Amino acid sequence: MNGKKLYISDVTLRDGMHAIRHRYSLENVRQIAKALDDARVDSIEVAHGDGLQGSSFNYGFGAHSDLEWIEAAADVVKHAKIATLLLPGIGTIHDLKNAWQAGARVVRVATHCTEADVSAQHIQYARELGMDTVGFLMMSHMTTPENLAKQAKLMEGYGATCIYVVDSGGAMNMSDIRDRFRALKAVLKPETQTGMHAHHNLSLGVANSIAAVEEGCDRIDASLAGMGAGAGNAPLEVFIAAVDKLGWQHGADLYALMDAADDLVRPLQDRPVRVDRETLALGYAGVYSSFLRHCETAAARYGLSAVDILVELGKRRMVGGQEDMIVDVALDLRNNK
């Protein structure tokens, strides 16, 4: 660690959207953002779970627009930066400009781990706006460390000043994480930061985040009570407690985070965010974590097991954006019964 302070990036108000079908009220957003700000996290990501303009038939409609959520958070935050997520093809540079005007100062431009080339315009425009611009390589387990590093290098070339390893499926272990960070560090400029976004489907979210920091990672994503897709993200309060015991600098108030997790976030969960049969299947099969709620809906509709649908999606190597295929897979399984 060399005494450097970790950058703590909270994702409760973006990835956490998946856990409650994108239904945060504006008051929920204000309360959670204020609690996070008071606890001194560095950034607070706010958007539909699938990023700017994710509200749709395919991904699920949000209770509010991205801009309403961003403005609600920006109104109460005094210290942290407001971040947002953009997936090229869903969000546009027009949406990015609107998010900037609403108060977002950090953007994570997210692509599948082999498709960094679709992010060039969005990264370049974010830099022109003066945003803290991050490249976000989703489903990082689906390519080799060497290929991931090549994609990271592309994003760096477009202007991203931080590149994330993103374990969207919660499918990686500590060795997988170490290999990917070593590969990135070997090709990126020394001044380019790296970040880790974990999911907890194999209960390794905190361990993988610690392994990333040991390999020189600068920024860590986490969420209150793990609020996120699948079994959730690395639980923020657990990660802070663990690294505090290691003597690492994080700048956050552990007890304030513990209170916010239990008092503000956990009561909102209509489906517990935890490792269970379905979320473990996500991690084991290497499936995009936000498929969980969609699969459970399809399973109920067609009289199937959500686990069977998830495992089949994993076999077919489905990735984020292919939510429409969940029903196709369910119908295939039903017809083959």
From Swiss-Prot:
SS bonds (residue pairs): none
Biological source species: Escherichia coli O157:H7 (strain EC4115 / EHEC)
SUPFAM superfamilies: Aldolase, post-HMGL domain-like
Keywords of the record: Aromatic hydrocarbons catabolism, Lyase, Manganese, Metal-binding
Positions bearing the site annotation: Transition state stabilizer: 14
A GO term for molecular function: manganese ion binding
Annotated pathway: Aromatic compound metabolism; 3-phenylpropanoate degradation
GO biological process, one term: L-leucine biosynthetic process
Active site, renumbered: 18
Domain Pyruvate carboxyltransferase intervals: 6-258
NCBIfam families to which the protein is assigned, alphabetical: 4OH_2_O_val_ald (TIGR03217), PRK08195.1 (NF006049)
Quaternary structure and interacting proteins, as annotated: Interacts with MhpF.
Highest rank taxon of the organism: Bacteria
Positions that bind Mn(2+): 15, 197, 199
Class of the enzyme per the UniProt entry, highest EC level: lyase
Protein name: 4-hydroxy-2-oxovalerate aldolase
Any Pfam family hit: HMGL-like
Homology family: Belongs to the 4-hydroxy-2-oxovalerate aldolase family.
Catalytic activity, reaction form: (S)-4-hydroxy-2-oxopentanoate = acetaldehyde + pyruvate
Entry EC no(s): 4.1.3.39
Residue positions binding substrate: 14-15, 168, 197, 288
Function: Catalyzes the retro-aldol cleavage of 4-hydroxy-2-oxopentanoate to pyruvate and acetaldehyde. Is involved in the meta-cleavage pathway for the degradation of aromatic compounds.
